[in-house]
Curated annotation (Swiss-Prot):
Catalytic activity annotation: Hydrolyzes the link between N-acetylmuramoyl residues and L-amino acid residues in certain cell-wall glycopeptides
Function, as annotated: Cell-wall hydrolase that hydrolyzes the amide bond between N-acetylmuramic acid and L-alanine in cell-wall glycopeptides. Is able to lyse whole mycobacteria, release peptidoglycan from the cell wall of M.luteus and M.smegmatis, and cleave N-acetylmuramoyl-L-alanyl-D-isoglutamine, releasing free N-acetylmuramic acid and dipeptide.
Main enzyme class: hydrolase
Pathway(s) annotated for this protein in UniProt: Cell wall degradation; peptidoglycan degradation
Location(s), subcellular: Periplasm
GO annotations of cellular component type: periplasmic space
Chief location category: periplasm
Chain ranges of the MurNAc-LAA domain: 193-370
Record keywords: Cell wall biogenesis/degradation, Hydrolase, Periplasm, Repeat
Protein name: N-acetylmuramoyl-L-alanine amidase CwlM
Family: Belongs to the N-acetylmuramoyl-L-alanine amidase 3 family.
Entry-linked CDD domains: MurNAc-LAA
Length: 406
């Protein structure tokens, strides 16, 4: 199947006409998301394959929804990449680990799923052939008497097809994530957290009018991150920011920073924008893809954060969603992105420029992290866990630990 190509930086949308549109149409047709349209059989007219028409727009939106992408009908970098990844089927190419330029695709995801069913792979089924996939493949090859070279070629494929039809299992990654949370205990002190404020550097985002004067979207998110960082540090957590004030790294760079720190959790803060001024509310996102792979702890934390922020601020509940954005799929720890409101909406904007609202959001996120590690024990109703109670609980856990060790 052909994979779409375009000039870097270009994005295609309804009404555009180019050769790249023909390739997008072919890619979606091969995936079964668009009918063959060389000729309209009802009228006998040829369809303009280079035209990005309304029917193609609907197919692109359906594809984006299925793949956990932003559903806007625009074929930009992320959607192009997803179309290319979706074009690969296991066996169509040789799979191996490429340092600096890892392979991505649905064929890699299928390989990961089969190795996971056989008990060799415990990571997320994310379609990324990294070191964890390489090591799992080599372990499988050694176990089954194959050349342990980490290359998924014809012989390894035949073996996998034979065994995969006989073995299926649960999600070792979910079990591993849950065990890490359980074994780390309910105490927040010592937990390592990456806080990721959006925008930064020359990317100021939109400017809002606050009580003390104009405030940019970047400054608003930085202020919220600082409030959250201060509360976490006061409770004994080890906190790191994903960027300085003068930089706006890409999502991949932010994920790399979190991985280098070896964080337990990553919490990303964003404002949402929309051309419609009516769009409003808060939403939280975790890793989840069309292969059925989900970050269980990421989903649990996103759910806690969503409920806490809604309860404390009264912002509209736009719910929790699984997505495949780089920030969520490239991090090696549970990661949640919180869109704290629509800065383009007058009501949300008026709330977000208020320091009281940002305090409430910061305390809600901290309470959500605490509830994640409590695992249901000594929990509080949503929206009622105060900062003073969190401090008191940390002291009681520390005191109990000292008494138990004496």
């Amino acid at each position: 199947m052909p994979s779409p190509r375009r000039e870097d930086g270009d994005a295609l949308r309804c009404g555009d006409r180019s050769a790249a549109v023909t390739e997008i149409r072919a890619a979606l047709t091969a995936l079964g998301m668009l009918d063959h349209q060389e000729e309209d059989l009802t009228t006998g007219r040829n369809v303009a394959l280079e035209l990005f028409d309304a029917q193609l727009d609907q197919a692109v939106r359906a594809f984006q929804q299925h793949r956990g992408l932003l559903v806007d009908g625009i074929v930009g970098e992320a959607t192009y990449r997803a179309l290319k990844e979706a074009s690969y089927r296991l066996g169509a190419r040789t799979l191996y680990h490429q340092f600096g330029a890892p392979l991505y695709g649905d064929d890699v995801a299928t390989l990961q799923a089969r190795l996971q069913d056989l008990g060799f792979y415990t990571g997320l089924v994310d379609g990324h052939f990294g070191l964890q996939t390489h090591n799992a493949l080599m372990s499988y090859q050694r176990e089954y008497g194959l050349a342990a070279d980490g290359i998924c070629g014809p012989e390894t494929l035949r073996s996998l097809y034979f065994l995969s039809s006989r073995v299926s299992g649960g999600s070792p990654h979910a079990i591993r994530e849950e065990e890490l949370v359980r074994s780390s205990g309910p105490k927040l002190s010592g937990k390592r957290i990456i806080i990721d404020p959006g925008r930064g550097g020359v990317d100021h985002g939109l400017i809002a009018q606050g009580p003390a004067g104009p405030i940019s979207e970047a400054d608003l998110l930085w202020d919220l991150a600082s409030r959250l960082e201060g509360r976490m540090a006061a409770i004994g957590m080890e906190t790191h920011l994903s960027r300085p004030t003068n930089r706006s790294p890409s999502d991949a760079e932010r994920a790399a920073t979190a991985n280098a720190v070896g964080a337990d959790l990553m919490i990303s803060l964003r404002c949402e924008t929309q051309t419609s001024l009516a769009a409003n509310g808060v939403a939280s996102f975790h890793f989840g893809n069309s292969h059925g792979s989900v970050s269980t702890i990421g989903r649990n934390l996103a759910d806690f954060i969503q409920r806490e922020v809604v309860a404390r601020t009264g912002l509209r509940d736009c719910r929790v969603h699984g997505r495949t954005w780089d920030l969520l799929r490239l991090t090696r720890m549970p990661t949640v992105q919180v869109d704290i409101g629509y800065i383009t909406n007058p009501h949300d904007r008026g709330m977000l420029v208020s320091t009281q609202t940002r305090d409430a959001i910061a305390e809600g996120i901290l309470a959500a992290v605490k509830r994640l590690y409590l695992l249901g024990k000594n929990d509080r109703p949503t929206g009622t866990f105060t900062f003073a109670e969190l401090l008191a609980h940390e002291l009681s856990v520390e005191r109990a630990g000292r008494l138990g060790g004496s």
